Amino acid sequence: MSEATASNISTHYYKLGHLGTVSFYNYVSFTDNDQSLLELELSIRYAHPNILVTYYNKSLYYFTFGHNNVPLETVSRDIELPDLAKDINTDVDLSKDVTGPNPGANNSPSLLANPPKSASSGSTLGAAVDEYLPFASLSLLKSIKKMILFNLSKNGAIKLFGNYCVVARDTINRSILYLDPILFPNGDLLLSMVVKERINLLDSSIIDLKYPSQDAPDINFVIYLIPSGIRCHLFDPTNLVRNFVRKKSAESENLIDLIKLSTGVEYSFNSEEENVWIKLIPNLKHLNNQTSTIAKFIHSVDNKKFILWPWKLCLLQFGKFEEVDEITSPDVTSSQVHPTSNPLDLIGDLIDFNISSNQHHNFAQPSQTLPFSISSVASTGGDAGIGSVDPHTTMEQQPHTLDLNDITTHMVPDLFDLQNPVPSEFFTKEVQDMPPVDGTEVKEDTNQDDVEMDDLFGGSDDEGDDSRNGQNSSKEDLFSDAIKEEPKDALAAGTPAELEKNQLNDLFDISDKEAAPDSGKYSTPAKEPKFKYLDIPKDQMTIKKSSSPDYNDPGAPLPIMPTPIIPVANSVYSTNPPTAAAIGTEGVGLSDDQSSGPYNQPQPKQEIFNSGSSASQIQQKSIFSPILFNPIIKSNIDTKYGKGGKFYVDKEASIGPEEKKKKTFRETSVSGYELPLTKEEDKLPITAQAVGLRKMNNSSLSLAESSMSASSEESDEDEEMPDVISNSPPLRLNTFNDSFGGVPMGNSGGITLNNNPINLSNYNTGGFGSPNSSVIGRFPNIKGESPFSTADLQQTVSPIDYEQSNNQHTPSFPTSQGLQITQSVNNGSGRTSSSDESPVKGISESSNYLPLILRSINVSTIPDIYLLNNLISDQLLPSFTINDDDNDNDLEVMRNNEMFIKAKHLDEFLELIGPNLVFDLGFNQGRSKLSYYMDELVKSKLEENKVFPNSYKVNLIEFLNDQKDYESKDELEDQLDFLDDIANDDDNILNPKSQYKKLKSIEWDALTENTKNKENFEKYKLIVNKLNSSVSTKDEVYFKLPIIKARVLKHNNILNLNNLAINFWKYMNFSPIKSTKHFQVLLISENNGNGTSFLREFLDLLIYNYKECNLGHISKVNLSTVETRPDLENINDGILLVNKDNDQTYNDTYSQINKKLNSLVELIKLDLINKTNNFEFDRPLLLLFVNYNDNLNSTLQISKVFRNLKVSLTNHQLPLVSIFTKIIPGSLIVKQDPFQNWLKVLSNFKLSKLSMNLYNQCPNGSTNKDIVKNTFTQLVKEPPSRIQFKFMSNNFKHSNFNDDIFLHLAYERSIDRNWFSAAWSDPLGVVTFTKSWYCSNKATRNGSGGYGRDTHDVATVCEEIWNKSNELFKKLNDEMNNESSTMGGKKFLVLTRINSIIPDDELIHWKRLSVKHKDISLIVLSVSHSPKLIFQDNRPRFEDTENCGQLDNFFKVFSGSNNSSPTTGGALVTSPNVLSFHSPQQFLNAPGNFLSPQDFVSTAGGAGAGATSAPHGGSNNPDLILHDFGTDVIGIIPKVPLPSFNSPTRLGMKIGYLLKEWMNGSRSTSRPRRSYLVYEVSLLSCSNYWDLDVLMKLILNHYKNLIVLNDILGLRKIDGNISKNESEDDFEQSLEFEASGIVPWHISAVGKSLVYLSHIYVDE
């Protein structure tokens, strides 16, 4: 233990001074102008950097230390104040406040360190203490912190950030540096300094403004401001560069001055590179110290007020994007798509063949839009989104190939009925050079009908021809006014020459020319779009019960002329789709007066559109017209008639009367319109055009060359659309059809961007939820983040358009920046848009920058990591299939890494996914890399920059000695004073109390540099070093935690063994302490064509090992179907396989498994009905899933399948079937080769660990509904050290509490307040339980929704936590009664809040519950998720090698014996590889000393981790025992009241530390000294009869037990501390394994759950 002495361990605290007295002054404003006081504080600190002044509680506090004697005149009236506070001198009274304490009053530090809550009757300060002293105590620490941060910032050591600062790790990466001053009652002033490296912030210089895309791969980031730390969003989230401006105005000068005053740094904005400003919108939620939903962290806000901020004063936090395998990724942006990548390909191939073959005869004219596809809509090229490209914008773009990362940046704006032209550069030469089409030939082709699709679904070409024959009359009746105003010669503007000449024409001109460049002086109307079978929206496949559907007469003939109606032109929020006239103007229902501007179209073009838009007219026809027959299809009503058009009446709530008449699009990638193709076009490469404010990358435009291609379902059905569709949302999803109508577009100001070499819209900087984003039907509820509610939808145009409509043009970049912005006055029709005539109000630049600088945001609201998995991908996978069942299907995701779930049956889902996240045996550690993080101690900036030279690092021993012992007097104290006179001053160590007196009399501080402070500091440090070397620590404050023993059963006898013996379970022939558990197993996996025989081998090995470990018996599931159900498949040998091809997505695999498990339920029910007794209802069923999918969301998807099975069992009334699940990675058991998979060699150790883990997770019985599951072992309770007499009141000081019940409960709420997770455990592992909840921000809904019980509020969660605790207390009490005749004692609930103190909204419920249940006594703790690497040895490593042989070898890795002689029996098995027994005979023939330390020479963990070597080399010493040094933990209870990491400004009742040497530090060459992992335990509240030292020691001993339970319950990796190689990944895994070895299991369980669950988006 001498190597880990407290005097040699330095902490993360710096001592900045020792104070005797502190004086403070309080100043108030005459005019109650609080802002003037704030500005005065900035000015004073800038003029006097070392002054202690702060604004708090509407007052200005000024502090001085008594030994400095700083006069009040330091705060001079002659301070030059900036222009923003010219009259500050007249507003602020610089004299003392007469109601406060007297200026210069000598207040002791103890009074400020522990201010009284109320003034006593004898107080000299009287009522003034009540009013000012508590604020003065907080203000002193606040002023010291501000002063330190200001000086460090001024010297360039740090940058202010939020309530702390950031420090540079290198040129780009920044970490948060936590600086917290502490004032002890004895006058010591300390500073805590810890760097949190888990949050990685990047400097804005990572983005090169000249060539952004070349230096920044995939820009998905969050912007934070320096110095406030406020999160901001881009003003225009569609385009990063368009937010940059170069502005030098009075407002920006004021901002620069404020930043200089607050940070002490004068930033230069002289050069062009430095003078870059960015338009940002502050996140109001973050301003209130609240975090946005982590699962949707990239989003936009409804606030339209922007600021201009220097780009150099921004920090970026990038999201983590999980790479998706190209084969399984639904990425259709590339030119090659796998033929069966879509679930509907088999059906799509047949339909596409019919469509494409018939379309050659049905083509009426060249399409008037550029071919359209899903990829063109969902891909983000050039400028995507609202206002990113105005009607007069052209951009030259270089080819840009999308990689997998680009998927996360694509946003779909076409859900909001907003239109935008596409530049002519995207027209390929093949399309422009198309040969002209003869009009007569086209006329003949239009007479052909697609009979197969039209007979059933209506919308035939007869109606289209009839409408075209009468187009003139129809046009005059409906849209006569609009036609008369337009010039008639605009029809001739369609030649290729005109196309090359007029690149800035509107969207419809471009579309016409591009599709028919040689159409001459006329154009033929577009073919009418028709619905097909696959395009029936999902919401139209059911008839709402309360809706009265119109009479459907499939035999009624179609009218020659649909009855005309008058469109409501001015209704932006019309419930009906836009009419043809509206589409012809701006795509919305605007009147003619509103149709001017960028989307003003020539009337002849409108005529073309109107005549061919009978699809819109059909839906707008009179109610007297016959209605087309669209069958209502429901598949699962009757198997025989399910696909033939069976009608179904939905039982859900009804919809509006107009809703079913609207044009809707289901949430799928299949379009609903036939695509007219000519033979010529069919032979050309099809080029996709962005419809709906979209530019495309050239590389993403090339699709299949033939409609017969395997990807024709995506291309043929979507690529060419009639123009009526190009003016409406092409894939508007059914959830949004009811809420959103058309939105007007204002003039974008005519900005033209030229020579832009990058795809700027690929930068997604917070645009999720914006009009340009892919907010689709499954994410409709983003209120608070998304500005697009129905109330203010008319304001959802681009903020750039708002600004430009107010003539606030963005200054242009010079050509050297790679961008050229010029002004264009061409507006199409020559008229000014309505947005220019009436500027929109409400969008303005904020001029009050003071809150953005002084409002220090709590950095704890910044998530450590956020994922981009839930950003919508390019391709919309279908959520509808032909066999779609009635249940909500959330298995199908947008892409393979999306993490999304519906709220229905969420509790069942959490019940199943919880154990797989927590008790995972470390399987998820390598894949997610989200489990453990540590706080590193960075090299001190105080030492580097010498900002405060008179300071030093505090050793641990200074906190372990009680200063009251030095201050107390005894009888001999006066008699020993002569020793002080005899001894010299330099060697006066005979009397420590006299040294402490001298130490206490020396006053100094590092904040003020002068000669006196320097001399006193050197004297103080010299005395401290002597005291540290001479004073010893007591066992009560610095002690080694005991070795934990476990209980096992051997030959029906209970044994208490070292917990290390659990690793030899099978060899020792142990049995579980409880009864055996029997269950049946069904192994689920995929068959990828490389063999499946290894699965049967693995299952046989597992069953055999489980039996050999005496844990019970596992049986295989065998179920067979009956002749009447040939659709069900038999299950044999407990294996269920699903075929998976290499080009098949895992989404398809999970869907197939889901169907097979539903069939399993039917097989079980048939077995019960037929009484074949193949299924054992008395045994639980294990679903063992072998997972080959490495994506992070695979656990989520598999758990959805398990949830569906459990729901299906409930629906089929099979409550006797009890299931539990286990997900293991395929890499654990399979060695994958290109052509053949092989079973890995699995050691008995791994198989035994897996068997014991399955025993723990198996329910106690099929009929036993106890929430507590028995574990295979329990820990041994320490025997009492003395007899406890309960009639004696000893104040709990010497009690062992053997009869009392302690239940540890750890819980945490995610920082976005959406998830709760809790874990329960007693110190012995008798009861263990975990549970998670989803805490909805909305009101809990019950009734028709059916999922109100799955979403909870805080009160409900706290109630359930308390109820579960009561159940577990009852279980513990029953266990105690069974083992002894005594009744249980008091019940103590150790309530542990992780990563925070208990906030008020939770605290109120805990108080209410504790008052209600007075039989339970609360002990409240606060801990962190992970340990911190903050303690370090002062001595270099291996400094004491000479004394190494005489030391206790504490904290040392076993080096092993060098005895290689083969003459002894022990030498025969000295190699760990030899120690493997394959039969009981080998075990019995082993030498007697085979478990001696020499048998485990090179083992670092696992079975023989760190065995103690024999001190004298004896190999047959019977006293040798196995001991794992990795389990050695030191308990520390400081005598000094230290604050908690989670609450640095609030002292707890007591604090304790768990200390463990970081073994992996020996492998790090960058650390020349030993480092120690520190885990902090802070006591916040307990009953007043507790002795705090006794209670803290008891808790630390409990935590040692709970740490041991990590391996017993299976939270850590099986062989995590056995290093296989020296790779970086292996080192990280060893590091995480070691870090988790000092964290109690229930705290690790909560962390592992929340880390995963917080990234799941719940669709409510």
Curated annotation (Swiss-Prot):
Ranges annotated as biased composition (Acidic residues): 447-465, 713-722
Nucleus keyword on record: yes
Gene Ontology CC annotations of this record: mediator complex
Entry keyword annotation includes Transcription regulation: yes
One Pfam family here: Med13_N
MF terms (GO), sorted A to Z: transcription coactivator activity
One GO biological process term: positive regulation of transcription by RNA polymerase II
Cellular localisation: Nucleus
Biased composition (Low complexity): 702-712
Chief subcellular location: nucleus
UniProt keyword list: Activator, Nucleus, Repressor, Transcription, Transcription regulation
Polar residues bias spans: 104-118, 592-614, 803-837
Location of region: Disordered: 94-118, 428-481, 583-614, 702-731, 803-843
Subunit annotation: Component of the SRB8-11 complex, which itself associates with the Mediator complex.
Family (UniProt): Belongs to the Mediator complex subunit 13 family.
Role summary: Component of the SRB8-11 complex. The SRB8-11 complex is a regulatory module of the Mediator complex which is itself involved in regulation of basal and activated RNA polymerase II-dependent transcription. The SRB8-11 complex may be involved in the transcriptional repression of a subset of genes regulated by Mediator. It may inhibit the association of the Mediator complex with RNA polymerase II to form the holoenzyme complex.
Stored PANTHER family: MEDIATOR OF RNA POLYMERASE II TRANSCRIPTION SUBUNIT 13 (PTHR48249:SF3)
Name of the protein described by the UniProt record: Mediator of RNA polymerase II transcription subunit 13
Lineage: Eukaryota, Fungi, Dikarya, Ascomycota, Saccharomycotina
